[in-house]
Amino acid sequence: MKILWITSVYPSSMKPGEGVFHETQVQELQKLGLDITVICPRPFHSAPVRMLKKTYRKKDVRPEYEIRKGIPVYRPFYRAVPGQLKWAQPHRRIASAVLKTMKQRDLYPDLIHAHFAMPSGGAAAVVSESAQIPYVLTLHGSDVNVYPHYSKGAFKAFKRAVGSASVVLAVSHKLQEEAKKLSGFDSSVLPIGIQLSRFQGNEETKEEIRKRLGLPLDQRLAVYVGRLVREKGIFELSEAIESLQDSPKAVFVGDGPAKSTLTQKGHIVTGQVPNHQVRDYLLAADLFVLPSYSEGMPTVVIEALALRVPVICTDVGGVSSLFGKHQHLLIKPKSAQALAEAITRYEHEQIWKPEVADDLYETVQAQFDAGKNAKALHHQYQTVTKTSV
């Protein structure tokens, strides 16, 4: 079976940490014998637009084509305009780039799988209609919780992407409920998961891992992993750490526009690290903190729980369904005070009890095995292709 993935994020040789969760699922599908091709369209701004903003002038260094871990990945350009997800939906321009690539590269998939309703899902709807190929859509978070609320045009694009798909999948129950409320259409819950074998056992001690990573041996560490952008709650975390008299040292693992600001404040900022090294930083942590304003089902939280690392996380997206009966441990977003109080409680009241760690570990083992979930996805593919004949 030939499957064409359309997504706005996928790892590359130049940015191996971008969209790793997609590659995890593709690798598991490949093990099942599926022939996967990825098209990851990238925006290109015209000369007049590039004059408006420095970020628009930044050159995209990702290769136009590469074979990545046995998977062909194409990155055609499409014309982008400022604020396009609000006022000038890009799905038709993206679809044109996808259709052109399909024609040039003789791609004839049996099925399309689009990730994120906006913009990839909207593009998939156009490609599906033009090429007469059915598509599956996976909803991840911001495509439901954020983008449809931008404007009437954005909402219309969201509803079309969801309504035109043969099957709609959501990475959490919370997302499933919100998508139903917004669009009126049903979906099934299917998380991507993680490769659990990578998170079993550890031969090194925490001290040995910290030595290898160059981290302090004599301080408590609160570790954050992700993009260094405001929407991830990093400034609230910084403020919370600074407000505590006996605070842990903050370690920000990742890159982004806030890197220099966080470094100037005296925090440890590692920059982008290879994906396989994220596990080491989690194991080096006394606390893992993810204070995002919005999420779908954050992979790094699942990874931390698989390693039994204490987690402080905001109550956003599907995290509450992941935490289940322990969701009272989640905190409200955009609050440095809530973060400071949570850190204090974790460190001095020992609210992260062994039974909490055990329960959440078992949840991850049962529901977030990437291999098992890929088999369920394969079944969805088979159902769609059979019914569309």
UniProtKB/Swiss-Prot annotation:
NCBIfam families: TeichurnBiosyTuaC (NF047684). InterPro entries: Glyco_trans_1, Glyco_trans_4-like_N, Glycosyltransferase_grp1. GO terms for molecular function: glycosyltransferase activity. Pfam families: Glyco_transf_4, Glycos_transf_1. Transmembrane segments: none annotated. Induction: By phosphate starvation, via the PhoP/PhoR two-component regulatory system. One of its GO terms (biological process) is cell wall organization. The gene is tuaC. The nature of the anionic polymer present in the cell wall of B.subtilis depends on phosphate availability. Under phosphate-replete growth conditions teichoic acids are present, whereas under phosphate-depleted conditions, at least part of the wall teichoic acid is replaced with teichuronic acid, a non-phosphate containing anionic polymer. The synthesis of teichuronic acid is accompanied by degradation of teichoic acid and reutilization of liberated phosphate for other cellular processes such as nucleic acid synthesis. The keyword Transferase applies. Its EC number is 2.4.-.-. This is Putative teichuronic acid biosynthesis glycosyltransferase TuaC. The keyword Transferase applies. It comes from the Bacteria. Pathway: Cell wall biogenesis; teichuronic acid biosynthesis. Keywords: Cell wall biogenesis/degradation, Glycosyltransferase, Stress response, Transferase. Belongs to the glycosyltransferase group 1 family. Glycosyltransferase 4 subfamily.
